[in-house]
Curated annotation (Swiss-Prot):
Residues 1-16 form the signal peptide. It comes from Gallus gallus (Chicken). Residues 52-73, 233-246 have a biased composition (Polar residues). PANTHER family: OSTEOPONTIN. GO terms for molecular function: cytokine activity; extracellular matrix binding; heparin binding. Keywords: Biomineralization, Cell adhesion, Cytokine, Glycoprotein, Phosphoprotein, Secreted, Sialic acid, Signal. GO terms for cellular component: extracellular space. The keyword Nucleotidyltransferase does not apply. This is Osteopontin. Major non-collagenous bone protein that binds tightly to hydroxyapatite. Appears to form an integral part of the mineralized matrix. Probably important to cell-matrix interaction. Acts as a cytokine involved in enhancing production of interferon-gamma and interleukin-12 and reducing production of interleukin-10 and is essential in the pathway that leads to type I immunity.
């Protein structure tokens, strides 16, 4: 395109060159024949004709150059911009919906106004109350309330099971201590009987014989009774303390369940 543009420029210059020469020749001829009025008139007419032709030629060349420049710019723009394929116009869903609405409106306008029924709508909409739960979680749901209650009951059951284990351990220790208390008097009784037998064998002639086993047995029975009473008292104290702990934990569990139900 640039080469074509340069060629057109050279052509226009070459075309304008003889026009300038003819103008110079006309000027020189007019200066030579200025004294002849008839020749002067013909020369002037010829000069006007040449000037008009040169102006038309220059205007034509300028138009050609402008058209070439426009074609050059348009070709460059077409090369830069990719061609977009022409797709057929598909009516969108919104346009179809608008057309359907227009048809419905036209149909409704065609009907009689006497068939229309006016219904009064309520001005105030019903409002459902919002129950706000506790801050720990979603207390407004029933499932959450049941899960919370199940967690509380499970924790109370675990505490009761642990308390029962502790009570069983305490009762086992008390039973072991009672058995130890029952066995210890027997050993002491045997030891006392042996000592008394030795003492009686040494002093058999000087002192009368006493029934040492009966005496030892009475002492052992008295000590066993005292130990049994102490064990019973300790067991009753443990039972009362366990009962108080159970009642306190049950009260706490009930209070926590009631709080969860109130907040829910």
């Amino acid at each position: 395109m640039k080469l074509a543009f340069l060629c057109l420029c050279f052509i226009s210059i070459a075309a304008a060159w003889p026009v300038s020469k003819s103008r110079q020749h006309a000027i020189s001829a007019s200066s030579e024949e200025k004294y002849d009025p008839r020749s002067h008139h013909t020369h002037r007419y010829h000069q006007d004709h040449v000037d008009s032709q040169s102006q038309e030629h220059l205007q034509q060349t300028q138009n050609d150059l402008a058209s070439l420049q426009q074609t050059h710019y348009s070709s460059e723009e077409n090369a830069d911009v990719p061609e977009q394929p022409d797709f057929p116009d598909i009516p969108s869903k919104s346009q179809e919906a608008v057309d359907d609405d227009d048809d419905d409106d036209n149909d409704s306008n065609d009907t009689d106004e006497s068939d229309e029924v006016v219904t009064d709508f309520p001005t105030e909409a019903p409002v459902t109350p919002f129950n706000r739960g506790d801050n720990a979680g979603r207390g407004d749901s029933v499932a959450y309330g049941f899960r919370a209650k199940a967690h509380v009951v499970k924790a109370s059951k675990l505490r009761k099971a642990a308390r029962k284990l502790i009570e069983d351990d305490a009762t086992a220790e008390v039973g072991d201590s009672q058995l130890a208390g029952l066995w210890l008097p027997k050993e002491s009784r045997e030891q006392d009987s042996r000592e008394l037998a030795q003492h009686q064998s040494v002093e058999n002639d000087s002192r009368p014989r006493f029934d040492s086993p009966e005496v030892g047995g009475g002492d052992s029975k008295a000590s066993a009774g005292v130990d049994s009473r102490e064990s019973l008292a300790s067991r009753s104290a443990v039972d009362t303390s366990n009962q108080t702990l159970e009642s306190a934990e049950d009260a706490e569990d009930r209070h926590s369940i009631e709080n969860n139900e109130v907040t829910r």
